[in-house]
Regions:
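Glycine-rich, highly charged phosphate/nucleotide-binding loops
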Residues: 60-70
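Acyl-group handling in specialized metabolite and lipid biosynthesis
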Residues: 202-215
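N-terminal Rossmann-like dinucleotide-binding module
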Residues: 1-40
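Donor/substrate-binding cores of folate-linked one-carbon enzymes
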Residues: 22, 81-200, 207
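An anion-binding loop in the catalytic cleft
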Residues: 214-312
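Proline-aspartate-enriched helix->loop->beta-strand connector
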Residues: 26, 78-80
Length: 312
């Protein structure tokens, strides 16, 4: 029987954990500790920890994997495999070297493209037409290990980070189940990554959340959906932060300065970019509830002709 330790944190990892546990059994789940969430700062377990408890799997939630305690807990399992999926911590070499059949990662990009912590967000923001999942051996260098298998999917115009997370999570679970028998037998392929083709997708910073309209409409649209539904991009409206949850491309040309609200649409309001208009469909003004953009502009029709700013 194959002994497996699974490491993961967000919703992306949960279908992978469930499928892995159903088919092989997971001996230990390692996830991030509970964190304060929301205005009331309620201590909340990450989705993988919640799933592990529901599945009745032993759970360990360390602040760091670089401690002697973490090494002992992993080594005591005597695992054949460590499998990670969006765990959120770098594993030291002494952990990576414990399992007899290797340490694997389910990464949400077509490596070596989009190494790093935000491959799904960055694929959308960059305007990529396709993305995918890679099963790889972990190495000391982040996301640089040998590739075992990969599967690509198309990025559609109606995708955002949330929909791509869901799609790639399912792809990752399926690809892992297809690949694991060969890994366990030791008959899988492993292909070194081409370093010259590597690109990097670091975690989203606060500065990345500012939506600028001073660029082509397609770039604005990609930026908005790449941050939706989290962490959500924003602009400024008369000194107040305006979050933009959703938008659409139009075939309308711009005849106003970038950032200008030019009028209403059937389901929102239109904002000028450098080469066309972006249709904003869901917003939230600071201190207010999230609202569909048509209701927002109907209640604030005096904003038509004003300009959304980039400060804040």
């Amino acid at each position: 029987m194959t002994k497996i330790i699974f490491m993961g944190t967000p919703d992306f990892s949960v279908p992978i954990l469930k499928e892995l546990h159903k088919e092989y059994g997971v001996d230990l789940v390692i996830s991030q500790p509970a964190r304060p969430v929301g205005r009331k700062k309620v201590m909340t377990d990450p989705p993988v920890a919640v799933a592990a408890k529901l599945l009745g799997i032993e759970l360990y939630q360390p602040e760091t994997m670089k401690s002697e305690e973490a090494l002992k807990i992993v080594a005591d399992i005597e695992p054949d495999l460590i499998i990670t999926a969006a765990f959120g911590q770098l594993l030291p070499e002494n952990i990576l070297n414990v399992p007899s059949k290797g340490s694997l990662n389910v990464h949400a990009s077509l490596l070596p493209k989009h190494r790093g912590g935000a491959p799904i967000h960055r694929a959308l923001i960059n305007g990529d037409k396709e993305t995918g999942v890679t099963i790889m051996y972990m190495a000391k260098k982040l996301d640089a290990g040998d590739i075992i298998a990969a599967k690509s999917i198309q990025i559609e115009d109606n995708d955002n980070t949330g929909t791509l997370f869901d799609k790639l999570s399912r792809v990752g679970a399926s690809l892992l189940m297809t690949t694991l028998p060969y890994i366990i037998e030791g008959t899988n392929k492993r292909t070194p990554q081409t370093e010259s083709e590597a690109t990097f997708s670091p975690n989203i910073l606060k500065t990345d959340e500012v939506i600028s309209f001073n660029r082509p409409a397609r770039d604005v649209f990609n930026h908005i959906r790449g941050l939706a539904p989290w962490p959500v991009g924003h602009t400024m409206q008369d000194g107040k932060r305006l979050k933009i949850f959703a938008a659409e491309l139009t075939n309308k040309t711009a005849d106003a300065a970038p950032g200008t609200i030019t009028g209403k649409s059937d389901n929102g309001f239109l904002v000028a970019a450098t080469d066309g208009l972006v249709n904003i469909t869901e917003v939230q003004l600071a201190g207010k509830k999230k609202n569909n953009a048509l209701d927002f502009i109907n209640n604030n029709s005096d904003l038509i002709g004003t300009k959304l700013g980039e400060d804040g």
